[in-house]
Design a protein with these regions (language model features):
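Alpha/beta catalytic cores of nucleotide-metabolism and tRNA/nucleoside-modifying enzymes
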Residues: 1, 137-147, 151-154
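An N-cap/entry alpha-helix motif that binds or orients negatively charged groups
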Residues: 1-50
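Acidic (Asp/Glu)-rich catalytic clusters
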Residues: 26-29, 60-64, 87-91, 110-113, ...
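Non-cysteine beta-strand/loop elements that form the S-adenosyl-L-methionine
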Residues: 36-38, 122, 168-170
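Active-site mouth loops of central-metabolism enzymes
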Residues: 36-56, 94-103, 145-150
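Glycine/Thr-rich beta-alpha phosphate-binding loop at enzyme active sites
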Residues: 44-52, 58-78, 159-180
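Glycine-enriched alpha-helix->loop->beta-strand junction motifs that scaffold or abut catalytic
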Residues: 66-69, 91-95, 113-119, 140-144, ...
Length: 180
């Protein structure tokens, strides 16, 4: 991304009306819980997962089953994802969460060039409240909600200091990879 920035070739933000991730989770849903259905090709703990299953089909099936939003792993090394999955999974029109290790403004810019409605910011990767706030504000300027992930009370304090509106808890400690 830095090379693309250097030669002034970063992808342009998509000029689309993104469905709101936050609004989808807050919308009345009868007595049913809101479900964020996740698509990932692999994980460090489980290895490969349904490598041949088309992302488009996963999105269709999740939507038909009543998911409110889709979570899409785009990290390439550990989860075998790609940014392209976001476009491939956009047909049902559900809000898409880009799950990746995002810690830089260029990654937020790259997200803005996709149909993602939200992106994941992990406090452990951005332990500076000012940086976390800056990345969140940059995302929101593109109409993208920021989902801020925490593990403990110290992370929660940083998330609150950053102005986070959506906070998710990860039971896995990213320092030790142990589940609490």
């Amino acid at each position: 991304l830095r090379q693309l920035e250097y030669i002034n070739m970063l992808p342009l933000p998509l000029r689309i009306e993104r469905p709101s991730f936050l609004n989808a989770l807050c919308a009345p849903n009868g007595n049913r819980p809101h479900v964020i259905a996740e698509f990932k090709r692999a994980s460090p703990s489980r290895g490969d997962i349904l490598m041949d299953f088309p992302p488009e089909e996963a999105a269709k099936q999740y939507a038909e089953a009543g998911a409110s939003c889709l979570s899409v792993l785009t990290e390439e090394t550990y989860f075998k994802g790609t940014l392209g999955y976001l476009k491939r999974m956009s047909a049902p029109g559900l809000p898409l969460l880009r799950k990746d290790f995002i810690f830089d403004r260029l990654q937020v810019a790259a997200t803005a060039a996709t149909p993602a409605s939200a992106l994941l910011l992990i406090v452990r990767l951005t332990p500076d409240a000012a940086l976390l706030r800056s990345l969140r504000e940059q995302a929101e300027a593109h109409g993208i909600d920021a989902v801020v992930e925490i593990f403990d009370e110290a992370d929660l304090a940083l998330a609150r200091d950053s102005g986070a509106r959506i906070i998710q808890v990860n039971a896995r400690d990213l320092d030790t990879l142990q589940v609490d």
